[in-house]
């Protein structure tokens, strides 16, 4: 089991997830991910639950969203939670987290420990500063290779997650790769090309290892990046639009979901469902891989004082008092200009009820330190 969290991987950067752009001619900056997506299960509409790197780990690895504030910065960060690593450790998995920054950076080692990882591999364990940039840590390509090689020393079953870093501001790549990737229109674009290449080489290395065929890979982003070129990516929806990709080398899990939404907090329950986990667990998210969940799944996040609820092709904005602010059909109205709140009162009311119920349960669980199974 492997989860790859890619720094600043906005959905806009992936050509195969943006076939509507440039009259269908948009290529994006991730040729490897485009090829992988054609053999994966992914979503037309998938979202982050936050806008910061520190929001991502609790969301992706423990199904705990950061609404309205980053969970790890709240008084509830000391609550008892049971992340994916904890659940898999109960089944005998060796669980390791990888991040190429200096150990302690952004508190990732502490969050990894809280969510159940037994082992942490950072810049210290990598132990070769010649492969580090001057800003964040070890370049993605050698660090992902290091992860694959380290995993090859593990006894199965194991679970690993990695948080990449090269595509973070100031958007620098190794000198030997300068000029090898499309510079596009934004400074980040060649960084995304570099990280995409690093992912390709990771999968090439992993594919030669005995554990590869038995491993489910999940690829997502920590959050979007402000460097986007298209107006739909600058909306309050676009600010959260990221990929959520499930890749099973055996080919048993393939498809492109165009209606059902997915979000970061859905990753843990989806993985546990796919692995036929047979113990009770608590998650704020849903199993996004379940075909019968079309009318139950929705996504949620928080931006500039408004909650945002996504279901099917609609996005509902809710005020801080949990009253509906505006409703949009983001398939037909990608720039979110035509408010449908009054013309579609039934949908507005249903989605508002979903949002209120979720927020009430979320707040009660946090206040009561009740974030595990009873």
Provide a role label for each language-model segment.
Residues 1-374:
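Solvent-exposed soluble domains appended to multi-pass membrane proteins
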